Amino acid sequence: MKPGIHPDYRTVLFHDTAADVYFLIGSTVDTDRSHTYSDGKTYPYVALDVSSASHPVYTGQQRKTQSEGRIAGFNKRFASFGSGAKAAQ
């Protein structure tokens, strides 16, 4: 590796603000903020809006947005066209 061209790899404190959960993860992210963690050490700090602790897919709180499949919706929408064509023949 060439010296001086790679970012510093260090332990960073990530905070999921939606779930109020902290993660200590090795990262190269650049941040000016720092925060003291529960272990008494000060780490670089990054606030997150969503993480695995608050995302609906990972928490099991995912809501089903479609009540029926795309094919069933298509058939329901165009069912009257098929019956009208048969009656005309």
From Swiss-Prot:
Molecular-function annotations in GO: structural constituent of ribosome
GO terms under biological process: translation
UniProt keywords, alphabetically: Ribonucleoprotein, Ribosomal protein
Highest taxon, organism lineage: Bacteria
Pfam families in UniProt: Ribosomal_L31
Keyword field contains Cell inner membrane: no
Record bears the keyword Membrane: no
GO CC, alphabetical: ribonucleoprotein complex; ribosome
Assembly, per entry: Part of the 50S ribosomal subunit.
Family under the similarity heading: Belongs to the bacterial ribosomal protein bL31 family. Type B subfamily.
Name by which UniProt lists this protein: Large ribosomal subunit protein bL31B
Source organism of the structure: Pseudomonas fluorescens (strain ATCC BAA-477 / NRRL B-23932 / Pf-5)
